């Protein structure tokens, strides 16, 4: 564990081992989120995969972390998306004021309303290959200590290895079966189905269709996932202007 003090190694390894013991493959990301909360001065954690045009929420330590994960997917903006795009950590240590609040004003407002004041996003991978992010949430503003950053990086590395090792393709049947993915991830298939339907209804590109979904979801105070479900069940229709 590069950067982790010798005296902390056994404690970190023990917590991770406790959390993942007897876990099914699809449970591993959620268990590692729980380990991150136990090991770090944070109130929540989530993990998202890097998807086509938007992140795919995979697992979270609780309802609030899952909600904030969905908020970024809906807005298409936030520190976690920046980390996925750059392959570098993004630490928003104070979403209530200053630089962080001005960089992501809408997300910062939504996070603060949910009681989160700081978000720390670590890439799962690096600048050359980034498969997603580990996102950490804290109720109070402030920077992570160096030891905590080292621990967070290690948990992110473990998550990266775990995600790459999860069965997929022929090992787990068709990807669409969601045999290893959590419900959060498989539910996001509906977003891509809705993008296709909006493309057909409005005669627009995939990027434009996703932008329309996001704009309508935000205007209605909903997540893009909830709106997508209405689109594919024909409850909501997008008509060309």
Residue ranges and their predicted role:
Residues 1-75, 154, 229-241:
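Intrinsically disordered, low-complexity terminal regulatory regions
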Residues 50, 58, 65-102, 109-117:
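Regulatory sensory and allosteric helical modules in signal-transduction proteins
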Residues 133-142, 147, 163:
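Short beta-strand-to-loop transition segments that serve as allosteric relay/switch motifs
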Residues 168-241:
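Signal-transducing coiled-coil/dimerization helices and immediately adjacent hinge/linker segments
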